[in-house]
Amino acid sequence: MPTHLLCRRSHKPRPTLPLTEGIALDLARVHEACGPARHSFALWLAAAAQGPVLWLSQPQAGRPLNPAQAARPLNPDGIAEYASPSRFLFVQTARAEDLLWAMEEALRGGGAALVVAELAEPPAMTPVRRLHLAAEAGGTFGPAPAGLLLTPGQGGAQGIESRWHLAPAHGLPPPSSSLPGCGAASRECWTLQRLRARTLPPRSWHITRARAGGPLQAAPLPPGAACQQTARPAASRVLPQPQSPLAAPALP
């Protein structure tokens, strides 16, 4: 029986969702974001996407076990700095299984440009594979969607297309004199790490953004610089007070 070693499918470049210069995420795939600023990473992608954004969560996923903070959506005032709140649809589910099912159906339908899922722990391999297939099917008759899993800690979802770690660096000096400063009155700064990707090596960037708004600016970091920044003790960091909190205020 003959064996075909070459694939007959065309190897067209996969469409991507550009975040900033030199940083892009493949569409029709599911990615993972972790780290203390992972919600900001999701909002960056939402700003770059063209179309509705579906945000799925559980009452306590990724949030402290505090009844006052349970089932609280993102603050529209904080979202408005990145994208119009009218583009967002928030859905909460009681179980992680229901959340993954809703994400799969949303990706397959292709109606949302970006589907974000907040999880209390990384999912197993089988659900992630199903999400990839659903995202590919969602681009059959139109632009392909992208999926993003928000997981605590260092992440660890199996089978994802890429894993990203984002941490704030607002009060830290830039690792190089050639990089923009992070003054509290002028710019916000983050350290972005690509921990893994199917076709790209690990890499780190120094991300800055003007507090008055505007595009993200990225500068590559030398190997090991990101680990030194994230490993600094919290007492040495002088973090500015957030001007627009992402969490909505508690109801009286």
Which residues does each PLM region occupy?
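A glycine-rich, hydrophobic loop/mini-helix early in the fold
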Residues: P36, A42-G109
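Short beta-alpha junction loops
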Residues: P59-G62, A120, L149-G155
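C-terminal regions of RecA-like/P-loop NTPase motor modules
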Residues: P202-P252
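Short acidic catalytic loops
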Residues: A106, A112-P122
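Acidic, metal-coordinating catalytic cores used for nucleic-acid/nucleotide bond scission
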Residues: R95, A120-T126
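Short hydrophobic alpha-helical runs that function as membrane-insertion/retention elements
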Residues: L54, F88-V91, L114-V116, G139-L150
